[in-house]
Amino acid sequence: MTSAEIRQKFIDFFKSKGHVHVPSSSLVPHNDPTLLFTNAGMNQFKDTFLGLEKREYTRAVTAQKCVRAGGKHNDLDEVGFTARHHTFFEMLGNFSFGDYFKEDALAYAWEFITSPEWLGLPKDRLWVSIYKDDEQAFDVWHNKVGVPADRIVRLGEKDNFWRMGDTGPCGPCSEIFWDMGPEYACDHPDGCRIDTCGCDRWREFWNNVFMQYNQTPEGLVPLERTGVDTGLGLERMATIMQGVWSNWDIDLWQPIFARIHELSGKKYEGEGPEAVAFRVIADHARCCTFLIADGVRFSNEGRGYVMRRILRRAVRFGRVLGFAEPFIWKVAGAVADVMGDAYPEVRERLPVIQDELRREEERFLRTLEQGMNRLEEILARMRQKGETVISGQDAFVLYDTYGFPLDIVRDVAREQGFTVDEQGYQAAMAEQRARARAARDVSYITEVQSRIAGHLEGVAPTRFVGYTELAGEGRVLAVFDQEGNATGAGEGSSVIIVLDRTPFYAEGGGQVGDTGQIVAPGLRVEVEDCRKLPSGHHLHYGTVQEGFLEVGQQVEARVDARKRKDTQKNHTATHLLHKALREVLGTHVQQAGSLVAPDRLRFDFTHTGPMTPEQIAAVEEMINAEIEAAEPVTWTEMPLDEARALGAMALFGEKYGEIVRVVSVGDGWSRELCGGCHVSNTSEVQYFKILSESGIGGGVRRIEAVTGPGVIRHLEEAQARAVEAQEQLRSRMKEMEKELEQLRAKLAASQTDSLVERAQEVGGVKVVAGTAPVATMEDLRNMTDAIRAKLGSGVVVLGAVTSEGKVNLVAAVTKDLAGRVHAGNLIREVARICGGGGGGRPDMATAGGKNPERLGEALNAVPGLVGSQLGL
């Protein structure tokens, strides 16, 4: 049976059981920051299991694309060396959202794998495991499905309690195993069993997870609705159905192996270094093909970096097969041929996929040879010294200089009998990150800038053109590392670049430095910040993403236009805020500091005491009126004395030159000395909203605010918080209601015993009459029944006052008193005293009353009324 047939049969089977076929979701999780990649079939249903999303169906079946590489679920190092590890794989799954649970889920699984109509596996080669305390699962497997008890294995939390990650839906699970046969048994001293050795004789292929909880940072929280999440690995199932030992021997891999054979001239024979290379290349080519199809691109962070590690590992293994030129992009064509019917996006996007792969291969091959030579030198030196562990520092240099991920160093070391000091590597990496962080500290920057300034003596300052341009040509005057040493820089290097001209605004006047790119043919640098030396040289802090950077290169500097525009809105809004505060609070208000960023603004000002809500509203109203008036924003340069004569506000303590830049709003409504970037008209700010006003000490207040799209984000976040608070309140109310019911039940139970103990005897008949702490007629009947049962023989009359101020009454008579005491007649007389009426059967009757103040009198009359019916 082919893999495609297994996939289709699975979908068809569960569709016959009322499941809706839901297409595979993207490998890039939607709106889930807890996941790097989609790594299980249930990822796309996470919000459904949590009760945050409601779907039109309660049963679903999927064939889901998954990747496990990076993060908690990371199989990368094992791929190629074991029979069943892959980075990309397919997970077949059936799901229940508050519909069926364990009994149906396990019965469906057994039917699919054993029925001749579907897979038809022999039952005597199947075993199951359950969570050690899951008696319900044992009962279903043994008593309902018919699995012998000695084939049901109990395992602990590590094996049979499933969690998607550190947070999210989870619960106990039950796995199904295939016995490869006694000829594959190991020699474990306690015997070869699932619960002793877990060796490759036992092939787990289907996991049934019973979603009962949500794992939060605080602990397990029961889900409102239980659910079922199952995962059947397609590759493992195909291994069983096709009668082969290894996942690599199934039909999905053979066309890909054939393509590698065609390109390399080598043959896949299952064992040895070349076989490992075949498997690594095939797996990693398939994984990268699907990731690129789903929009992931190679980069130095996040998903893109993990994909880069995967591809570079494959390229390195390509050397084992003799590849010296890009080749994985050609293997991707075979992947599309094999997988394109099930996943058409791979075939449709193949040109883009191959182009991305080819360019990334070319980029890495430029440094691979040098890096491998350096690694061989390290290994040769170690052999001479009799050492077996590659130092963490050496491994880090291979990464930092040649772009070798730790995976590659580890693989080469393993092949030649060496290991890697991974702790030392991580320490070197942490040290570099600490240096990068320190490079942002003022004290460190002063030292670094001093060193850089020494190198730049006699070099003309950078010409800033960013007021009118967001992109422009420039020449590289100098390149420094994070410690201020002059250098050239290759891919992955953190650098500080000085250009002869730039559109990048350097941090100053509260405005953050621009971000963007510096590019040239074969070169791309991501600029993360821009600062300025007192000498006027702009320092562009960034990371080389592609190519090699050196002095003298002609480059194009490109500012991130969206971020700059948002920053300009916030900077103009800061000027409007300053003016409005002086209008509303008084001219004593002076700017004491500010932060102008793309997503927000912060303004510190002198003022004693908090602003009132009315003052905050007045400031907002004044600013938004200026925005709506669409006033022009202009700037001009003039002598400092002239600017002061015009009334331009200056920042206290700031140093200004003889010629200053004055930014004006409208016809001088606001006029400030400012070297920052602004919109050309107040209407571009769109809207202004104050988020908070607080004191930061010493008679200085702080306002935080947003403009334009930031206001929309703020409102959306506020709405989300309100919804969340509403949900939490609703949940808490439900909990309180439940707690109240429990308290009432406890009180009722206690009252029951007390009333029975205080029963009176009338003519030899036990009589109980009293009030009950219950809210409803149903609760009152239940309590009456409980007392009647405890009495064994007798009469019970209970009363309770409702929340509406009405009286509920119940009378009950034991069967042995039938014909002597009539409950309906008795309750009618009792109710009459309370201003009501009622009646009912001889053994049980209910009534109501309007006068709760007479309930005690009515209950006191019960013994006499019972005596009357007994003829006493």
From Swiss-Prot:
Protein biosynthesis in keyword set: yes
Biological process according to GO: alanyl-tRNA aminoacylation; negative regulation of DNA-templated transcription
Subcellular location, record wording: Cytoplasm
Gene Ontology cellular-component annotations: cytosol
Primary enzyme class: ligase
Binding locations of Zn(2+): 571, 575, 674, 678
Highest taxon above the source species: Bacteria
Gene3D superfamilies, A to Z: 2.40.30.130, 3.10.310.40, 3.30.54.20, Bira Bifunctional Protein, Domain 2, Threonyl-trna Synthetase, Chain A, domain 2
Primary site of residence: cytoplasm
EC number(s) on file: 6.1.1.7
Free-text comment on the cofactor: Binds 1 zinc ion per subunit.
PROSITE patterns found in the cross-reference section: AA_TRNA_LIGASE_II_ALA
Cofactor(s) annotated in UniProt: Zn(2+)
Pfam families tied to this protein: DHHA1, tRNA-synt_2c, tRNA_SAD
Keyword annotations of the record: Aminoacyl-tRNA synthetase, ATP-binding, Cytoplasm, Ligase, Metal-binding, Nucleotide-binding, Protein biosynthesis, RNA-binding, tRNA-binding, Zinc
Catalytic activity: tRNA(Ala) + L-alanine + ATP = L-alanyl-tRNA(Ala) + AMP + diphosphate
Keyword Lipoprotein annotated: no
Comment text on domains: Consists of three domains; the N-terminal catalytic domain, the editing domain and the C-terminal C-Ala domain. The editing domain removes incorrectly charged amino acids, while the C-Ala domain, along with tRNA(Ala), serves as a bridge to cooperatively bring together the editing and aminoacylation centers thus stimulating deacylation of misacylated tRNAs.
Membership in a protein family: Belongs to the class-II aminoacyl-tRNA synthetase family.
Cited function: Catalyzes the attachment of alanine to tRNA(Ala) in a two-step reaction: alanine is first activated by ATP to form Ala-AMP and then transferred to the acceptor end of tRNA(Ala). Also edits incorrectly charged Ser-tRNA(Ala) and Gly-tRNA(Ala) via its editing domain.
Protein name from the UniProt record: Alanine--tRNA ligase
Source organism of this protein record: Symbiobacterium thermophilum (strain DSM 24528 / JCM 14929 / IAM 14863 / T)
